[in-house]
Amino acid sequence: MARRMTVLVTGVSGYVAGQLLPDLRRRYTLRLVDVRATDRRGRRVPGVEVADLAHPDRDRYARFFRGADAVLHLGYRPPDVKTTGVWGADPGALETCDGELANVRMAQNVYRSALDAGVRRVVAASSNHAADWYEHALVHAGRRDVVSPADLPLSDNFYGWSKAAYELLGFVYASGSLGRKLEVVLLRIGAPRDVSGRRYLGKLVEQHVAPGASGLANFKRDLGAWLSPRDLRQLVRRAIEKRDVRNADGVPWVVVYGISGNTRAFWSLESARRVLGYAPQDDSEVAFAKDVRRLLSGPRARARGGRLGA
């Protein structure tokens, strides 16, 4: 019988971890770490140990890394600044840089601790926002159809910048210049949430297209960005278990987009398919077909035609 891998999971009280933990518990021997022991609803996460991975004294949490085969880094600390969540029209956005720097320092601590402990691989949650300038400036303007992980990671906000920093920092550790090659897989997660049409007909909670864009424009966008629960589970399993994640230059470092096989996708899955063997099972156009017909394509559709846009 094959030995169960030991996986350290950070940020286990968060939303994405909540979707993954049941499957992870079945497949691996887990070590669970977060800065708090309860999830968003105040429920205790079984098995979690409280530790602050952003603290500069890595000896405080080195024990969690020792003997682990892989680290799944989902930890994130939101900046202590009130923001509206509306891209391009958020007066609080300028004040988020220091908070995001703390998250970059946490990523550094994770990479360094993994390297020191002999961990083979770190799988880190990056974000589609690591290169969201292309989406904001080009995709929704009809000037570009697809964004690839091979494109220079350019973001127009500090959250996206910090995620791009995770990626480039990971390359330093994967390059072998620090003594050995730490394998690093970066997951640019899309929209791992419900994107049914009713969410987009009222007041928007988040705005990803452009300030003042319609809810239906955001509905189309999120249909392209959607990541189903089972595709999320598959992607993470493959990121942890794939034997060889070396790129064409022999460096074990890969950036992949985390979306389902969506008809309206505008992010490339090429590296996820080629390197990880990811084979998405779901498509938002099918999963939310009733809303697509009602709002976008039926006789009473409220939106103009086109894959994206209002």
Model-derived features with residue positions:
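N-terminal Rossmann NAD(P)H-binding glycine-rich loop of SDR-like oxidoreductase domains
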Residues: M5-R27
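NAD(P)H-binding glycine-rich loop region in Rossmannoid oxidoreductase-like domains
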Residues: P46-G47, A51-R105, S113
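Catalytic helix-loop patch of NAD(P)-dependent Rossmann-fold dehydrogenases
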Residues: D90-L101, E135-E183
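Conserved catalytic Lys-bearing alpha helix of Rossmann-like short-chain dehydrogenase/reductases
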Residues: N103-V110, V119, S162-G170, L232
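Conserved Rossmann-fold NAD(P)-dependent oxidoreductase catalytic core, especially the SDR/UDP-sugar
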Residues: Q108-D156
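Flexible, glycine-rich beta-alpha linker
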Residues: A130-D132, F158, S175, G179-E206
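Alpha-helical substrate-binding/gating segment
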Residues: P192-V195, Y200-A217, G224-P252, G261
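Conserved C-terminal active-site "lid" loop/helix of NAD(P)H-dependent oxidoreductases
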Residues: V245, P252-A279, R294-G306
